[in-house]
Amino acid sequence: MIDQVKGTRNLYGKDIDNYLHIKDKFLNCYASYGYKFVELPNIEHKDLFTKSIGENSEIVTKQMYEFEDKAGRSLVLRPEGTASVVRYHNEFHKDQSNKYSYFGKMYRYENPQKNRYREFHQAGAELIGTLDNYSDVQLIKSSFRFLNSLELNFKLKINTIGSVDERKEYVSVLKKYFDKNKKDLSKESVEKIESNTLRILDSNVQEDLQIIDLAPLITNYLEDETIQKY
């Protein structure tokens, strides 16, 4: 007998009912706000993610399912949905502003644990081509409405990571800070100082927490225009 692949799951009975219920709620909610659903391919070019996520990111270096097809092209099973939506927009609707929703399977080679799989579903909404505050508020409101419709106990936190230039300056400051304190960081975080600095802030490793708590704040590196918009 051949077993299912490690890190995957079968949806049947109550599980598939819950899945279809969540998907239906999601699609109806975002459609009511003008988001158009796009069905994306599970297979993408590897370069799409090395360029968007970063070739040194943990997803690219450790988690992507990648292979070479018979034509010699480097392909991957998509690890997340945002890059695929942006690829679709730039390929077919580049000069327009559009609102997209997506719901589909993603793949990451991680250690399977409770409620965490190597093949999993991700839902998302992307707003491309507009900078006005109203659109941001609408996206936040639609997300709140969707989660609320599932009767979940959740807390909505709103953040800003600034502009590209502001973020670049902040990452530079963070690198210097973490490099100065690397003797007190976990091995995993030390490895991310150069390649994926911001991800250190997500660490739950006990020895990292105090260093992270004292790290510089991005709010100190935002321009007045960004702060006012936020």
Regions found by a protein language model. Give the residues of each.
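TRNA-recognition modules of translation machinery and tRNA-sensing kinases, especially anticodon-binding
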Residues: M1-Y230
